[in-house]
C-alpha cells in the first residue's frame, strides 16, 4: 500500500442477507499516537486473510495515502461513512466513541466476521470496553473479544515515565493494564537492553498480558483475533493461565502493578458481590500508605456455594460480571478462589485479608 495508485476505491455497500447471524467479535485497538496503530490497521485492511473485517477508525489522521483515500470520496468531498476494500474489509471514520458506527454496522453485519475498533492515543480503552457490557441492545449483536495495546519500542518507556498530576493515572500505563495483548512495535529502532527493560516494565504492570514484538506492525492475525478474553468458553485455559500469574514488582510506574492470591473453600455469591462492589465502586480499601486501591482490570476463577461449575470473574473499572464456565469442579479437586488484580496502589496482603474477612462472615467459606 505504499503506492497511491494502489489505494482502494469506494464501492456501494449492499445490505446484509436475511436470516440469523452469529454475534460478531470486537477487538479494541489502543496505543499512543505514533506507536503503530494505523500501520497495524492498514496492514489488516489490505492483507489477504480471507476474513471479512470491519475497521472503525476513531478519526482519520494526516499522512498515508490509504488514510487520504479513505477520507475523501470520489467527488472530492469528505467521506465519513463506509468504505469497502478489495479484500472484503470495511473501513469507517467516526468522530464519537464508535457506538453509532457499530450500530450502523449491525445493519450490514451479515457481511462481516470481525470488527476492529480504534481509540485515540489518549483515550481510556476501559471506557470503550464498558459500553459492550452496558448496552444490552449491542450485546445481542457483538461481544468484546479483547483489548490490544500497541507500544512504541523507542518511546514506550518515556510515555510510561511521564509525570502526571497527583491522583491521575498515566495513560500509557492504563492502556497496558487493560490490555489482553500488547504489541511492542518498531523493535528494530532499539537495542536489546532497552527492549528488555520495556518488556519487564510491561510485565510488571500487567502480569496477565501476552506480549508480541514486531517491526512495522506486522503480526500474525491469529495472534490478534479470537482472543476470547471476556468469555467463558475455555475455563480450563483461564484456570491454567491464572495459576502461572505471580504478584509483580513495580518498575517505572511504582503505583501500577499486578496482585494475585488464592483462598481455599467455596464462598457466598452475595458476600462476594459486596466485597467486589466495595473494591470497585466504593474504593473502600487503602494500602499501607493510606492511598485508595484502584483496580483497573480484575480476573478470577472462583468456587461459589451451591455451584458445581467453576465461575469466572471479569472486571474493567467499575463494571464486573460473574459467569459460570463449562468446567466442573472434579470430585477430588480442592475448591479454591484464585484472583488477579491489575491496578494502582494495590497491596496484596491487605487485599487478601479484606477478601477473607468479607467472605468469611456467616460461615460463608465452606
UniProtKB/Swiss-Prot annotation:
Annotated GO CC locations: cytoplasm; nucleus
Motif window: CXCC motif: 89-92
Residue ranges annotated for the CobW C-terminal domain, each copy included: 258-357
Reaction(s) catalysed by this chain's protein: GTP + H2O = GDP + phosphate + H(+)
One Gene Ontology term from the biological process aspect of the record: intracellular zinc ion homeostasis
InterPro entries on file: CobW-likC_sf, CobW-like_C, CobW/HypB/UreG_nucleotide-bd, P-loop_NTPase, Zinc-reg_GTPase_activator
Span(s) of short sequence motif psi-PxLVp motif: 5-12
Primary residence: nucleus
GO MF term list: GTP binding; GTPase activity; metal ion binding; zinc chaperone activity
EC assignment: 3.6.5.-
Top-rank taxon, per record: Eukaryota
Binding sites annotated in the UniProt record for Zn(2+): 89, 91-92
SMART domains in alphabetical order: CobW_C (SM00833)
Localization per record: Nucleus
Binding locations of GTP: 31-38, 92-96, 185-188
Sorted UniProt keywords: Chaperone, GTP-binding, Hydrolase, Metal-binding, Nucleotide-binding, Nucleus, Zinc
Phenotype upon gene inactivation: Mutant fishes survive to adulthood under zinc-replete conditions, but display moderate developmental delay, characterized by reduced height at anterior anal fin, standard length and snout to vent length at 6 days post fertilization (dpf). They show impaired zinc homeostasis and cells show impaired activity of metap1.
Cited function: Zinc chaperone that directly transfers zinc cofactor to target metalloproteins, thereby activating them. Catalyzes zinc insertion into the active site of methionine aminopeptidase METAP1, which function to cleave the initiator methionine from polypeptides during or after protein translation. Mechanistically, the N-terminal psi-PxLVp motif binds to the C6H2-type zinc finger of inactive form of METAP1.
Family: Belongs to the SIMIBI class G3E GTPase family. ZNG1 subfamily.
Protein name, UniProt field: Zinc-regulated GTPase metalloprotein activator 1
Biological source species: Danio rerio
Gene name as annotated: zng1
Amino acid at each position: 500500500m505504499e503506492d497511491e495508485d494502489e489505494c482502494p476505491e469506494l464501492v456501494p455497500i449492499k445490505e446484509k442477507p436475511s436470516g440469523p447471524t452469529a454475534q460478531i467479535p470486537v477487538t479494541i485497538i489502543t496505543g499512543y499516537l505514533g506507536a503503530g496503530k494505523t500501520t497495524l490497521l492498514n496492514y489488516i485492511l489490505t492483507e489477504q486473510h480471507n476474513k471479512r473485517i470491519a475497521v472503525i477508525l476513531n478519526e482519520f489522521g494526516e499522512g498515508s495515502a490509504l488514510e487520504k483515500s479513505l477520507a475523501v470520496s470520489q467527488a472530492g468531498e469528505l467521506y465519513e461513512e463506509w468504505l469497502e476494500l478489495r479484500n472484503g474489509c470495511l473501513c469507517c471514520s467516526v468522530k464519537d466513541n464508535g457506538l453509532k458506527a457499530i450500530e450502523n454496522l449491525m445493519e450490514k453485519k451479515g457481511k462481516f466476521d470481525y470488527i476492529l475498533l480504534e481509540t485515540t492515543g489518549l483515550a481510556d480503552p476501559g471506557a470503550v470496553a464498558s459500553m459492550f457490557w452496558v448496552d444490552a441492545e449491542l450485546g445481542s449483536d457483538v461481544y468484546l473479544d479483547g483489548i490490544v495495546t500497541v507500544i512504541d519500542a523507542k518511546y514506550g518507556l518515556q510515555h510510561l515515565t511521564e509525570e502526571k498530576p497527583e491522583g491521575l493515572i498515566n495513560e500509557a500505563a492504563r492502556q497496558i493494564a487493560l490490555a489482553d495483548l500488547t504489541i511492542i512495535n518498531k523493535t528494530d529502532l532499539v537495542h536489546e537492553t532497552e527492549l528488555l527493560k520495556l518488556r519487564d516494565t510491561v510485565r510488571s504492570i500487567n502480569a496477565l498480558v501476552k506480549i508480541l514484538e514486531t517491526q512495522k506492525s506486522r503480526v500474525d492475525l491469529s495472534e490478534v483475533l479470537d482472543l476470547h478474553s471476556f468469555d467463558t468458553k475455555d475455563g480450563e485455559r483461564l484456570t491454567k493461565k491464572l495459576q502461572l500469574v505471580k504478584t509483580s514488582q513495580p518498575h517505572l510506574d511504582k503505583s501500577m502493578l499486578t496482585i494475585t492470591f488464592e483462598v481455599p473453600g467455596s464462598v457466598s455469591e452475595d458476600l462476594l458481590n459486596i466485597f467486589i462492589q466495595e473494591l470497585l465502586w466504593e474504593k473502600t480499601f487503602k494500602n499501607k500508605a493510606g492511598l485508595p486501591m484502584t483496580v483497573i482490570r480484575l480476573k478470577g476463577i472462583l468456587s461459589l456455594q451451591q455451584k458445581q461449575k467453576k465461575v469466572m470473574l471479569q472486571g474493567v473499572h467499575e463494571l464486573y460480571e460473574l459467569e459460570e464456565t463449562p468446567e466442573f469442579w472434579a470430585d477430588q479437586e480442592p475448591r479454591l478462589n484464585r484472583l488477579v488484580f491489575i491496578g494502582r496502589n494495590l497491596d496484596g496482603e491487605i487485599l487478601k485479608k479484606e477478601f477473607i474477612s468479607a467472605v468469611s462472615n456467616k460461615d460463608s467459606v465452606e
